[in-house]
Amino acid sequence: MRQATLYRYRLPVDAGVALRNQRLKSRDGLLVRLHEDGREGWGEIAPLPEFSHETLPEAQEAACRLLAQWQVGAAPAESPLPSVAFGLSCAQAELSGTLPQAANYRSATLCNGDPDALFQVLQSIPGEKVAKVKVGLYEAVRDGMIVNLLLEALPDLHLRLDANRSWTRAKADGFAKYVNPDWRDRILFLEEPCKTRDESRAFARDTGIAIAWDESVRDADFRVEAEPGVAAIIIKPTLTGSLQRCRQLVTQAHQAGLSAVISSSIESSLGLSQLARMAAWLTPGTPPGLDTLMLMQAQLLRAWPACTLPLWGEDTLDVVWQG
């Protein structure tokens, strides 16, 4: 007998969690739980405001419809809404035992704040130092100076940078001007520096700074292929789609000689733990980009190793559908 429950959650986040044009006051999403023959599987459906095309109410409506089909024994078609496709596929994979338990919790450290604070955080990273720094929020020249300062101060540091398509080509060049050419190879990649792919390609060609595709991966016309100056693709499953779709992209990237990085869309600790399992399974040896739990004020159902945030249980969830 099949049983399904859809819950809604609301997690408080730290003040000042900025998206593109707004600040998050809470992280709202859905959890799905499937039961069948004594087995259980969970998944998270959490569209990210300003990044997901679907809203949370739209995702909830679609999930309820698909769960009703599943509950009576059907095999529902994959949802066209990425967050719904991802969450349901995770729940089904846990139910069937096809999502391996092994997880890669060693994420690239997400760095925010002033350079002195960043230096202290980065200096304390044990072993290989891989960190992610958001750029494009301030002046490009300032970003270039800070990146240069960090690379100069920490010779064993490698950086992933993310500009979210925020720069014109002129601003991107202003950033590069302040990064010592001798240290640019320690920038593993800069995600989408410019507003268009062609400008980003030209930037990589002219500066020697490798780039990665992030937003482009979700464009309808995107194809995974080897290109000069392109080092990686970033896969954010909540924004991309089902486990099967993500696995397909990883395979295509590896066949093209590119790295694939599993990355967070500010999911709860439950969703993040599933992303860590995906990373260990699909991209072993590549640190995922999952260091977003520090933005939360609580964990949800499943604890992240060594995290000291309080763990919220099922009593904090609201049931929105059951069958």
Curated annotation (Swiss-Prot):
Keywords: Lyase, Magnesium, Menaquinone biosynthesis, Metal-binding. Its cofactor is a divalent metal cation. One of its GO terms (molecular function) is O-succinylbenzoate synthase activity. The active site is at K134 (proton donor), K236 (proton acceptor). Pathway: Quinol/quinone metabolism; 1,4-dihydroxy-2-naphthoate biosynthesis; 1,4-dihydroxy-2-naphthoate from chorismate: step 4/7; Quinol/quinone metabolism; menaquinone biosynthesis. It catalyses: (1R,6R)-6-hydroxy-2-succinyl-cyclohexa-2,4-diene-1-carboxylate = 2-succinylbenzoate + H2O. Its EC number is 4.2.1.113. It holds the Pfam family MenC_N. InterPro entries: Enolase-like_C_sf, Enolase-like_N, Enolase_C-like, Mandelate_racemase_C, OSB_synthase_MenC1, OSBS_N. Mg(2+) binds at D162, E191, D214. GO terms for biological process: menaquinone biosynthetic process. Converts 2-succinyl-6-hydroxy-2,4-cyclohexadiene-1-carboxylate (SHCHC) to 2-succinylbenzoate (OSB). HAMAP family: MenC_1. Belongs to the mandelate racemase/muconate lactonizing enzyme family. MenC type 1 subfamily. This is o-succinylbenzoate synthase. It comes from Edwardsiella ictaluri (strain 93-146).
